[in-house]
Amino acid sequence: MRQKWWTLLFVICISLLLTACQGNRAATPLSPVEAANLAAEWATTELAVVNGGFYEEGEYETFLYKGMNYRYLASHIDSKKKLTAELRKTMTKKGAKRFMKDNGIISYKKRMAQPEAEFVSELMWNVATVKEVKAKKSKMVMELTVPIGETRTAEKMKFTYVYKKRHGWRIDKVEK
């Protein structure tokens, strides 16, 4: 009988210990490869968003707002909730807000919209080089050098990465 109590107590202690440790993910250092991959994923999202998303046939709508031509974003990112969710795959909440502001994205008649323009990128993210500028436990600044097409030139950008317990490493700021 006494053996059963000790076994039961042991099982309860182990399960409590495992439960307590589950949500406590410690920040692991961000490797240069992980930093480059996250930046490349962000760049893909950025290009899609600044081009309005992936429009379906007949979905593209424009309007005049404060003397400028605007377009509604595609249906998969046409609400603040959808757009934020898409950006939060690679960015922090603060970074996503900054991105929307910097790119002139507004809410108009309950839909997200932006100034009408088209963007093309020749940045070759698959061969980007990464240099660590500053590192703390849950914040890192990396400088990425990304070649531009076949021009033999490159663009340097500073990425600030922040570790969030719930989501892991995310981009907080991009300086071009």
Question: Which stretches of residues belong to each language-model region?
Answer:
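Short beta-strand edge/turn micro-motifs at domain boundaries
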Residues: 154-176
